[in-house]
Amino acid sequence: MTKVRASHLLVKTEQEAIELREKIVNGELAFADAAAMVSLCPSGANGGDLGFFCKGQMVKPFEDACFSMEVDEVSQPIQTQFGWHLIQLTGKAD
């Protein structure tokens, strides 16, 4: 079974996610630093690292994004019932 490893940050608004993504992809801000500074998720303290997980362990929109990404890619903002996420895929394993 394929597993992925991802880091994420969680914010309240799409606009905040868009602005953070722009800074991250332009190299102005490291993903882990952004997560530590602004994420509403407790994982922010670890740079947003969620570790490895399989399909069925995360909410569907989040999971769908993770399993369609390439390693080191930063997602567009993803909305879930928790808020707006940016995801950075950090690994894949079989």
Model-inferred region functions:
Residues 32-40:
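Short, well-ordered alpha-helical segments enriched in acidic and aromatic residues
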Residues 25-32, 72:
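Glycine-centered tight-turn and secondary-structure capping sites
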Residues 1-10, 37, 61-94:
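Proteostasis/folding factors centered on peptidyl-prolyl cis-trans isomerases
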